[in-house]
Amino acid sequence: MWSSAEIRKTFLEYFEERGHSVVESSSLVPVNDPTLLFTNAGMNQFKDVFLGLDKRKYVRATSSQKCVRAGGKHNDLDTVGRTPRHHTFFEMLGNFSFGDYFKREAIGYAWEFLTEVVGLPEEKLWVTIYQDDDEAADLWPEISGIDPGRIVRLGEKDNFWSMGDTGPCGPCSEILYDRGIEYSCGAPDCGIGVCDCDRWLEIWNLVFMQFNRDESGEMTPLPRPSIDTGMGLERLSSILQGVDSNFDTDLFIPIIKRIEELTGKAYEQGERGFPFRVIADHSRACSFLIADGVLPSNDGRGYVLRRILRRALRFGRFLGIEGSFLYKNVDVVCDIMQEAYPELLEKQDFIKEVIRLEEERFLLTLNDGLKKAEEIMERARQRGDNVIPGEEAFMLYDTYGFPLDLTEDMAEENQFTLDKAGFDRSMEEQRQRARQANKGEDLLGQERLLSEKLAGIAPSSFTGYENSRDESVLLAIIKGSELMDKALNGEEVILITARTPFYAESGGQVADCGIIKGQEGLLRVQDVKKLSAWILHYGIVEGVLTTGEGVSLQLDDPARMDTARNHTATHLLHRALREVLGEHAQQKGSLVEPARLRFDFSHLKALSSEELSRIEQMVNEAIWKLYPVTTTVTALGQAREMGAMALFGEKYGEEVRVVQVDTYSSELCGGTHVQNTGQIGLFKITGEGSIGSGLRRIEAITGSYALEYIKQLEDELKKAASALRSSPLELAKRIENLNNSLKEKDKEIENLLQRLSRSSSDELVNKAFQLNDAWILIEEVDIEDPGSLRQNAEMLKDKLGRAIVMLASIKGEKVSFVCFVSKDLLEQGLHAGKIVAAAAQVAGGGGGGRPDMAQAGGRDKSKISEALAEARKMVKKTLS
């Protein structure tokens, strides 16, 4: 029997033997692609190659790509576990041709691999083609010998692929496996393209990228057609391992067995096994996403991870697990996948810790959600209402991760109803906002359009590592998206020159600013960006600039130097963080500009003042040691052998630039730096905080900015010391003494308030009366705060013993009621929820709650006496 590891290895070796370069799976976090939330197909990392924006040394490639489909346009989250095939995380095996081979070879490779290498029976294989693709219809029988009766023509929806509204596109051909009539849905017309039953299992999709579609929809043949194929490893494994579901393969069974151990329950097929399948799938997705740098948060990718993780926890609770458990599955996931993805093993402990902390956070969140739900119901009672608004239920779900079914249960327990239509409305509004926010495809279309118009313009040459000024030729002027011959005074334009010292925004470093000067005008450069091979200078024209004229380019030297100080400082900071906190404290993002630096890194808790002090001291010591800073351009593999760190979220070519700070630090980096650490002068941390679960941020300044900051701190310290009649060095002790004095005063005030409260309680107790050995206290009080009202009522109930206590208070125009019934009176039929509901109804409101404790609200404060009288009447009747 084939193992999944053998299938993956055999696939890659098969294509490598046929001239394909084996390319590592790219990260699940797409690099420089705003159209994607997660990598969801093997072709994602080759998108720029297909678009002609990037070139590789190879024209044939093969890969086993990590993919996630959860969130965004491609979202299988709610289907996971309900079907045998859908997953949040999966692997896509693929082979690609960039203008090399085409349909004949792609069909031949696919057929040979399936029938001869892994041995699938030919008679079990079916093929779909695009309805107008006669070429594929002829090639399939010729190459494979397949019976034309097993070739099905389908329309554009099923068998035509495109990258977007415009750009590369083409027909596709899918290979399906017939699992047999016993798996049929039983419909008379059951067949490929008619139904989605489990008889017809889609295995491999071959995309024939042969056209370019323009804005009018017209398609013209590509000069060099390409191939993009994808086959799910999980699906092929299920066939070759002879099991009915992907979840029964060796990719999932060890995880499911671990869940059985954790729950003490046996896995079953069908509906009973649904929670096991969800947890197994989500364990894989969480492990791989965290390994690729995604951390739980409230937006973007982190929000999707949080949803996946919390969904798994909910199903764990369904299986009877109350505490943290999901992190215990990570070891099993790593054991299954470590050979193909060694990064999992390297980050195993970090992945477990992130998941464990998020689990604990969610358990607290559930408690917070319970409190919030109580507050929502209390506000409804104050309004005289017993409906939980849909938008508030959605807030519980979205902000607190509070499952809707728990909100529904709470509503039922408290005799409330839930506005489900309002909840659905809020959910749809959020989806609309997400769709509005995802403008990446528009951006990609604009870049593609601009690239097409610049096709005849020579690439820009960056000279800014060596120079801060240069002489060049103005190659192009762009206004809007049109090429212009001239740029006039006041116009906002983009300039492209043959040579430029201006650094384009990249890798967290902001663009250079400065001036591009021509014979009759100039451009004050406000921003610089890179588009493929061109460097674009953005700004507003003063005078007139003309295409083809000679221009002088001059950077703002002080700003460039300040930026260089901060960029080199981030490298020193990165090293110090890993020294003090551990190797897991790796860069997750940065901002480098003249006035400051910002550095994001992975760490699971706030830094102590001692840790911050050590980090700051280490950076300053590296500065004062006057380390030389050198750069080397070398092959990516050679750079890794040199020990250079590759940073998360960066896209590297085959040649990379290594920035070395003596033996202290070595990183792949394209930014600008000082020549010697002494040029940084001084480093000062100004802030540290959380920007998401497991993600911290340090803000800092260097050079003259750091010196000015320290002077400001000193001035403020002197002012504070003067105000408190102290010296700066004795200020902390003076503040401590003042705090101690304030605490003593607070205690005195608290004692006075408690004595006052006891006095008020004693007065109320005297108003209680007895009926059949039960104390009854139903009174109006002057306590506006609902929490205090509830606290006082409970205290009075405890003081009276066998009692029913109901208090009412007025706030504004509304009335609040709270009622407590001692447990020994519940058997006599007293029900707090019914009592407050009756009283609230008299006051024009509503509410209810549990038999032992309930709250309600009324709209008419003038009816408070009648409401209390109604409550007394009801209690007397019940006890009599």
Curated annotation (Swiss-Prot):
<dbReference type="Pfam" id="PF01411">
    <property type="entry name" value="tRNA-synt_2c"/>
</dbReference>
<dbReference type="GO" id="GO:0008270">
    <property type="term" value="F:zinc ion binding"/>
</dbReference>
<keyword id="KW-0067">ATP-binding</keyword>
<dbReference type="InterPro" id="IPR003156">
    <property type="entry name" value="DHHA1_dom"/>
</dbReference>
<keyword id="KW-0648">Protein biosynthesis</keyword>
<dbReference type="GO" id="GO:0004813">
    <property type="term" value="F:alanine-tRNA ligase activity"/>
</dbReference>
<dbReference type="InterPro" id="IPR023033">
    <property type="entry name" value="Ala_tRNA_ligase_euk/bac"/>
</dbReference>
<dbReference type="InterPro" id="IPR012947">
    <property type="entry name" value="tRNA_SAD"/>
</dbReference>
<keyword id="KW-0547">Nucleotide-binding</keyword>
<dbReference type="GO" id="GO:0140096">
    <property type="term" value="F:catalytic activity, acting on a protein"/>
</dbReference>
<keyword id="KW-0694">RNA-binding</keyword>
<dbReference type="GO" id="GO:0016740">
    <property type="term" value="F:transferase activity"/>
</dbReference>
<keyword id="KW-0030">Aminoacyl-tRNA synthetase</keyword>
<dbReference type="GO" id="GO:0006419">
    <property type="term" value="P:alanyl-tRNA aminoacylation"/>
</dbReference>
<dbReference type="InterPro" id="IPR002318">
    <property type="entry name" value="Ala-tRNA-lgiase_IIc"/>
</dbReference>
<keyword id="KW-0963">Cytoplasm</keyword>
<dbReference type="InterPro" id="IPR018164">
    <property type="entry name" value="Ala-tRNA-synth_IIc_N"/>
</dbReference>
<dbReference type="InterPro" id="IPR018163">
    <property type="entry name" value="Thr/Ala-tRNA-synth_IIc_edit"/>
</dbReference>
<dbReference type="InterPro" id="IPR045864">
    <property type="entry name" value="aa-tRNA-synth_II/BPL/LPL"/>
</dbReference>
<dbReference type="InterPro" id="IPR009000">
    <property type="entry name" value="Transl_B-barrel_sf"/>
</dbReference>
<feature type="binding site">
    <location>
        <position position="567"/>
    </location>
    <ligand>
        <name>Zn(2+)</name>
    </ligand>
</feature>
<keyword id="KW-0479">Metal-binding</keyword>
<dbReference type="GO" id="GO:0005524">
    <property type="term" value="F:ATP binding"/>
</dbReference>
<feature type="binding site">
    <location>
        <position position="571"/>
    </location>
    <ligand>
        <name>Zn(2+)</name>
    </ligand>
</feature>
<comment type="similarity">
    <text>Belongs to the class-II aminoacyl-tRNA synthetase family.</text>
</comment>
<keyword id="KW-0436">Ligase</keyword>
<feature type="binding site">
    <location>
        <position position="669"/>
    </location>
    <ligand>
        <name>Zn(2+)</name>
    </ligand>
</feature>
<keyword id="KW-0862">Zinc</keyword>
<dbReference type="Pfam" id="PF02272">
    <property type="entry name" value="DHHA1"/>
</dbReference>
<feature type="binding site">
    <location>
        <position position="673"/>
    </location>
    <ligand>
        <name>Zn(2+)</name>
    </ligand>
</feature>
<comment type="function">
    <text>Catalyzes the attachment of alanine to tRNA(Ala) in a two-step reaction: alanine is first activated by ATP to form Ala-AMP and then transferred to the acceptor end of tRNA(Ala). Also edits incorrectly charged Ser-tRNA(Ala) and Gly-tRNA(Ala) via its editing domain.</text>
</comment>
<dbReference type="Pfam" id="PF07973">
    <property type="entry name" value="tRNA_SAD"/>
</dbReference>
<dbReference type="GO" id="GO:0000049">
    <property type="term" value="F:tRNA binding"/>
</dbReference>
<dbReference type="InterPro" id="IPR018165">
    <property type="entry name" value="Ala-tRNA-synth_IIc_core"/>
</dbReference>
<dbReference type="InterPro" id="IPR050058">
    <property type="entry name" value="Ala-tRNA_ligase"/>
</dbReference>
<protein>
    <recommendedName>
        <fullName>Alanine--tRNA ligase</fullName>
        <ecNumber>6.1.1.7</ecNumber>
    </recommendedName>
</protein>
<dbReference type="GO" id="GO:0002161">
    <property type="term" value="F:aminoacyl-tRNA deacylase activity"/>
</dbReference>
<keyword id="KW-0820">tRNA-binding</keyword>
<dbReference type="InterPro" id="IPR018162">
    <property type="entry name" value="Ala-tRNA-ligase_IIc_anticod-bd"/>
</dbReference>
<dbReference type="GO" id="GO:0005829">
    <property type="term" value="C:cytosol"/>
</dbReference>
